Amino acid sequence: MKARVRRLLLVLAAAALLLDGGLLLAGRLGAASLPEEDTAYFLDVGEGDCTLLVSGGSTVLVDAGTPEGAPALVRELKSLGVRRLDAVIATHPHADHIGGMEEVLRAFPVRSFYMSAETQSDGLDAALRRRRLTPLVPYDGETLTLKGGASLTFLGPAEDIPADRVNDRSLITLFQTGSASVLLMGDAEEPAEQSLLRHHPELRCDILKVGHHGSDTSSSPAFLSALGAQTAIISCGTDNDYGHPAEQTLTNLTLAGVRDIRMTAESGTVALPLIAYKENAV
């Protein structure tokens, strides 16, 4: 009798181990993983801004939305397979762009942190100290090379933009892959657009992350015409208080030949695989 009980207990223990191992394996197999191919995610953070760039496993986060949306942002990043961030960029100090940074820094190991010279926040400073990160202010033309071969170049702000024009002193970044280029404008407005074209007259892009949530202070006709973008992404909240995007901005984009205009307020998070983008563009 005792022998039978011992055998039964051993069988039950073995079954429990197999079940536990199977669950663990299923958990590992079911975990999300980042794509190896170059991809741009324009995350839906309501009336805010956040973009995730992926290349060969390297990850760059540009802005982090609002404080209120930070927990949901962290959950979405984890659901996409983010486990660490190679670079985080704070374009400028407005809360709808850097409000979620503290939560992001708590949730993920971060290799490097870039910000505009004007970006200061006691909470953000404390979060950076906890991570033992020294914030870097990039220079115009500074380039980061990602594992997949893509590059991210900082464009401005130039010295001809006054320090008190916080939106126009946003860090502007150009993400370039073998197939496509993505220009992220932060909250830059028309003076910054003019400055950008003066200092980088050769600038072109396939995908434009529209400046200042589609406000009528950005996306001037001359700027859009020079860029030649085919796709435009506007990050804005549903029924927001600012009227974003402005009808004039949508008109300017259409007249400039932008064939694909997407708004996170309508589409949610927009994921754009960039491989062979030009061949597959609408």
Each language-model region and where it sits:
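Non-globular, low-confidence helical/coil segments that flank catalytic cores
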Residues: 2-282
